[in-house]
């Protein structure tokens, strides 16, 4: 639901909105989609962040998470996902599926708002 996505993006806004470089964070959830932990996965450069998918899954497995919400910022202000963002989302979804962990959303934040892969119907169910 849109209200869920709005709440999800608020989870990360204080960490990510004023940064001059990209960072990727994850929120780990229990089977009822309640956030149990937030983890910074990677600081990045001005235009993109490099993400080791193993670190995402390691954090989720260690927390016994059922779901993952990905979130990163675009310091440029653009809310449009890059081809790198799309590829990363797809790769993490495939890897997480093998572990029975759901990707609930991938949110991109900027000063002008947010973009939600879930809202746009871009996550594999």
Task: Pin down the residues of each PLM region.
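Short, small-residue-biased leader/transition segments that mark boundaries at the very start
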Residues: 1-6
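Active-site-proximal loop/helix of nucleotide/amide-processing enzymes and allied scaffolds
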Residues: 10, 28-32, 42-125
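Short, P/G- and charge-enriched loop/turn segments at secondary-structure junctions
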Residues: 12-15
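Short loop/turn motifs at secondary-structure junctions and domain boundaries
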Residues: 17-20
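Short glycine-rich loop/turn motifs
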Residues: 23-26
